[in-house]
A protein has these predicted regions:
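Charged (often Lys/Glu-rich) extended helix/loop segments that serve as interaction or gating elements
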Residues: 96, 105-188
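Conserved strand-turn element in the central/C-terminal portion of the radical SAM core barrel
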Residues: 29-42
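Short glycine/threonine-rich loop-to-helix capping motif typified by GTGT followed
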Residues: 43-49, 80-92, 118-129, 188
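Active-site mouth loops of central-metabolism enzymes
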Residues: 8-13, 40, 44-46
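Short, small-residue-biased leader/transition segments that mark boundaries at the very start
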Residues: 2-7
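Alpha-helix-loop-beta-strand connector modules within alpha/beta enzyme cores
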Residues: 54, 93-103
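Structured alpha-helical segments in the cores of large, soluble enzyme domains
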Residues: 11-29, 54-66
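Glycine-rich beta-strand-to-loop/alpha-helix junction loops that act as flexible
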Residues: 37-38, 71-81, 112-114
């Protein structure tokens, strides 16, 4: 049976006492550590801080004769949602994880989720109407918020590509769906 313990800040927890309680239990075997440090993290330094924390934790556990076999590093790596955003420095992170793995002789588990699948979807839509507003044009498409709800729910940005060259678009435009709902929009 798997048990989990959340340690937000080791200085606030009597870490050694907890470890000894676990170690002396007939029902608990400590063999893995798992972390979750956030989502859409764009830099490597938070992950490096986490690896340093794990190095210290594994060293403390080793002193108590507890061998960690697995470390689940979770996910958290960001993905770019448009061409302006920079990509996550994966090679640098991978190098740091490799060194951590070698130092601690553990198997690494990742939960990359969005990092692997976040950019694989595409919606192909056609313009069904152009509405002239006072300050901008609205391009009404045959796709709606029910096809891509992330913008309505999270104000998420997605790259919009047109078959026309961008320099041919002279005025501010907003791409929207045909549902009469203020959040049925995809972006400008």
């Amino acid at each position: 049976r798997q048990r989990q313990m959340c340690i937000r800040d080791r200085s606030k927890l009597e870490f050694k006492k907890v470890i000894m309680d676990f170690k002396n239990s007939d029902f608990i075997e400590i063999s893995a550590l798992t972390v979750h440090i956030g989502s859409q993290i764009k830099e490597v330094f938070p992950f490096n801080n986490c690896l340093n924390f794990l190095n210290k934790t594994i060293a403390d556990l080793k002193k108590a004769n507890i061998k960690i076999k697995y470390v689940d590093l979770g996910g958290g790596m960001s993905i770019p949602y448009d061409f302006k955003e920079t990509k996550f420095p994966l090679k640098k992170y991978a190098s740091n994880v490799y060194n951590f793995k070698k130092k601690n002789n553990v198997k690494i588990i990742f939960e990359p989720g969005r990092f692997l699948s976040g950019n694989v979807g595409i919606i192909i839509s056609k313009i069904i109407y152009i509405k002239e507003g006072a300050k901008k044009k609205f391009i009404v498409t045959d796709a709606a918020m029910n096809d891509l709800i992330r913008t309505a729910l999270y104000d998420a940005n997605h790259t919009i590509l047109t078959i026309y060259r961008r320099n041919e678009i002279k005025s501010k435009i907003e791409f929207v769906g045909p549902i009469c709902e203020s959040s049925d929009k995809f972006g400008e």
